[in-house]
Swiss-Prot record:
It holds the Pfam family SCAN. There is a cross-link at residues 20, 25, 196 (Glycyl lysine isopeptide (Lys-Gly) (interchain with G-Cter in SUMO2)). May be involved in transcriptional regulation. Residues 203-230 have a biased composition (Basic and acidic residues). Belongs to the krueppel C2H2-type zinc-finger protein family. This is Zinc finger and SCAN domain-containing protein 12. It is found in: Nucleus. Residues 154-175, 198-264 are annotated as: Disordered. PANTHER family: FINGER PUTATIVE TRANSCRIPTION FACTOR FAMILY-RELATED, GENE, 19965-RELATED.
Length: 611
């Protein structure tokens, strides 16, 4: 049968669409009261325009006329400016070139411009870079269903996919849509996904018609095609009870319970839906529309009494309050660790089970979290959008760029709570902390202290006096190689660590970090006894000896002890017959530099008198 049909009535008119197949007329009961500013109606006409087939017309003139009409209904030049039309075309292409892993997620946000897409993607990138509990809520009974839905999402594109759009109408029940949005939250860990699920459980417009109309279009166009029961549930008896289930009066869709029947009839195109005047989105319940409209008005009526933060929905406020109460009701049966959200527990349990649901299509590598897959994909695409302005090195993640910039600035944001040592990278801090937490099984026979194997070897050199690392210039020896490297900079004059504020350079990174606190005024090391604060950990240790009375530096000549090494060095010059500091004018020697400086003023005075 040749499917030559023509649009008899424009969509602008308050008449239903008439479709002509051969000599018979079929009037679809699809709700064609699509407002001109409705985003979803524009999407329908865009798909008609893109999927239009030449064979559906009687000749080239009719084909051109039909294409013009569909394009007019999509772009609407009578209401849109040239800039708005260009933006629609750019948006369409932008969505098309996105990776498949991102397309479905971005389209869930219903962006209306390219800038909105960029904002959504940048927000996602920031959330993936920030550690923390991912947000999602779904019950344990849904777990098996959600796993199946994840599989279905991986096997095919969503109904609004721009890469592989098919002209086949699709209908999804509100239960299925809600559960799929929950799966999306698990995959991305996106806070907005939960807000959308809890506050504005929006319904996609139903009954999207295809470009080819079948004979039974008047029936199927109202609600679209439905999935068979066995596709969305694992219950084997679902098909056998099909004849006993209630059905929709409009299209014969089988429903499991009377409550489903009532809910289904509410969302059927034959029933009135609640549409948003601002963006055109439709909802099955008036309460959902009211909550959705708060996105446009900015109204946040639910306020936290603890911190004053406001939210659009009550359920989001309830979840937020867990932060203040510290409640962690979800506990892991394997290790006993507790979590504030079920989704965080679910992801944690994959560490014990070894489950990895997210697979890379290029190399097959699997990941337990969606965030891990997103970052891995950039290896194949070689996408490194974040560039360092100092050395032009590029990175795939903003967080890695931020850490890298610490190499140039000398910033060390990751500090050990045990010893105060700071690091540029968080991974370096984690490795360092293992020194404190690791079981120390190797004990020193001299003093009884315990160390790791390598730590014990270095420690024993204190007792044996062994210094295997020797300077080639001055032959000074050191216990550790790092100490030798830092010492050699005295001879080479190398000062690789430079202060951005004053330009002063240093041989050691730790000295630069302590110096920078002069500019910032930061004094992170505080004495528990008197409350005095210090810039460096060594200054605090020396100060604490005032309270403890400890004097670890002892003179070998007379046995006198001192708190600081510098005080011992000054004292030892008393025993040395020759003075350390010699005046270049007269050759006189002094034990202290301050005495030499004071002496040199005499020569300066003599020179001024003679002049």
């Amino acid at each position: 049968m040749a499917s030559t049909w023509a649009i008899q009535a424009h969509m602008d008119q308050d008449e239903p669409l008439e479709v002509k197949i051969e000599e018979e007329k079929y009037t679809t009961r699809q709700d064609w009261d699509l407002r001109k500013n409705n985003t979803h109606s524009r999407e329908v006409f865009r798909q008609y325009f893109r999927q239009f087939c030449y064979q559906e017309t009687s000749g080239p003139r009719e084909a051109l006329s039909r294409l013009r009409e569909l394009c007019h209904q999509w772009l609407r030049p009578e209401t849109h400016t040239k800039e708005q039309i260009l933006e629609l075309l750019v948006l369409e292409q932008f969505l098309t070139i996105l990776p498949e892993e991102l397309q479905a997620w971005v389209q869930e946000q219903h962006p209306e411009s390219g800038e909105e897409v960029v904002t959504v993607l940048e927000d996602l990138e920031r959330e993936l870079d920030e550690p923390g509990e991912q947000v999602s809520v779904h019950t344990g009974e849904q777990e098996m269903f959600l796993q199946e839905t994840v599989r279905l999402r991986k096997e095919g594109e969503p109904s609004m996919s721009l890469q592989s759009m098919k002209a086949q109408p699709k209908y999804e029940s509100p239960e299925l849509e809600s559960q799929q949005e929950q799966v999306l939250d698990v995959e991305t860990g996106n806070e907005y996904g939960n807000l959308k699920q809890e506050v504005s459980e929006e319904m996609e417009p139903h009954g999207k018609t295809s470009s080819k109309f079948e004979n039974d279009m008047s029936k199927s166009a109202r609600c679209g095609e439905t999935r068979e029961p066995e596709e969305i549930t694992e219950e084997p008896s679902a098909c056998s009870r099909e004849d006993k289930q209630p059905t929709c009066d409009e299209n014969g869709v089988s429903l499991t319970e009377n409550s489903d029947h009532t809910e289904h009839q509410r969302i059927c195109p034959g029933e009135e839906s609640y549409g948003c005047d601002d963006c055109g989105k439709a909802f099955s319940q008036h309460s959902h529309l009211i909550e959705h409209q708060r996105i446009h008005t900015g109204d946040r009526p639910y306020k936290c009494e603890e911190c004053g933060k406001a939210f659009r929905g009550r359920t989001v406020l309830i979840r937020h309050k867990i932060i203040h109460t510290g409640e962690k009701p979800y506990k892991c049966n394997e290790c006993g660790k507790a979590f504030g959200r079920w989704s965080a527990l679910n992801q944690h349990q994959r560490l014990h089970t070894g489950e990895k649901h997210y697979h890379c299509n290029d190399c097959g590598k699997a990941f337990s979290q969606k965030a891990g897959l997103f970052h891995h994909i950039k290896i194949h695409t070689r996408d490194k959008p974040y560039q360092c302005t100092q050395c032009n090195k590029s990175f795939s993640r903003r967080s890695i760029l931020t850490q890298h910039q610490g190499v140039h600035t000398g910033a060390k944001p990751y500090e050990c709570n045990e010893c105060g040592k700071a690091f540029v990278y968080n991974s370096s801090l984690v490795s360092h902390q293992e020194i404190h937490h690791k079981e120390k099984c190797y004990q020193c026979k001299e003093c009884g202290k315990s160390f790791s194997q390598s730590g014990l070897i270095q420690h024993q050199r204190i007792h044996t006096g062994e210094k295997p690392y020797k300077c080639d210039v001055c032959e000074k020896a050191f216990i550790q190689r790092t100490s030798l490297t830092e010492h050699q900079r005295i001879h080479t004059g190398e000062r690789p660590y430079k202060c951005d504020k004053c330009g002063k350079a240093f041989t050691q990174r730790s000295v630069l970090t302590e110096h920078q606190r002069i500019h910032t005024g930061e004094r992170p090391y505080k004495c528990d006894e008197c409350g005095n604060a210090f810039r460096g950990i060594t200054s605090l240790i020396q100060h604490q000896r005032i309270h403890t009375g400890e004097k670890p530096y002892q003179c070998d000549e007379c046995g006198k002890a001192f708190r600081q090494r510098s005080d011992l060095s000054k004292h030892q010059r008393i025993h040395n017959r020759r003075g350390t500091y010699v005046c270049k004018e007269c050759g006189k020697s002094f034990r202290q530099n301050s005495a030499l400086t004071q002496h040199q003023t005499i020569h300066k005075g003599e020179k001024s008198v003679s002049v």
